[in-house]
């Protein structure tokens, strides 16, 4: 059972009068999405849809909302050449990893938890923004700039033993934008059965994060969500998907953005 939080909090302003205020996590998410620079027209359009929901629907982090927040985690290895996929039981297709917000506005934490719960892998979310890799500079997995003893800012979710397992990867300068949001998409979900109950058609207001993980860590399926897991070359995410819209609109985009990230 996940810890739950209200996306809006009631604050006593005196005289028995209460007003609803945005939680810090919801406000941060809105700020990150507002700062996000769309990669294409799909992201530009969907960014506005997601922001409208975040600013107007206090229930958008709950599954009861017709359009509700969800998150995905596009997970790559240290070379940025392989990604981790699951065989999704409902979609009957090889798929990225993700899940519902379920009342939690910190979607970064939700994404990392979904990755661990559904695959057994600990991930490290990489900053995105509009950053450009700094030519010739590499960062070790423990967050130390090669040739220096000065640590870079470290993701608090990254365990020491996990971080030490990474090879070096390009240092990236994200001062032009900042934030961790890698991709945005509004996803349609057709009605389906889950755990013996019918779930009506709805929309996922999806925020995707880019993460790095160690492919040598043993994979563990989550039988109520998936039935197989594997690391594959980036382009195989397109080849293996049986969902045309996801394949052509999302996976091709994610692959292009991944390759642009580490140029």
Question: Which ranges hold each PLM region?
Answer:
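NUDIX/MutT-family hydrolases
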Residues: 208, 212-213, 220-251
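Polybasic/polar functional segments that serve as interface/processing modules
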Residues: 99, 105, 110, 134-137, ...
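Charged phosphate-binding loop/patch that engages nucleotide di/tri-phosphates or the phosphate backbone
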Residues: 246-263
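Basic polycationic patches enriched in arginine
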Residues: 2-4, 10, 140, 150, ...
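Conserved Nudix-box catalytic region and its N-terminal flanking loop in Nudix hydrolases
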Residues: 79-117, 121-124, 130-132, 158, ...
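Acidic, metal-coordinating catalytic segment for phosphate/diphosphate chemistry
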Residues: 32-72
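Active-site-adjacent beta-strand/loop module that shapes the phosphate/pyrophosphate-binding cleft
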Residues: 136-155, 160, 169-217
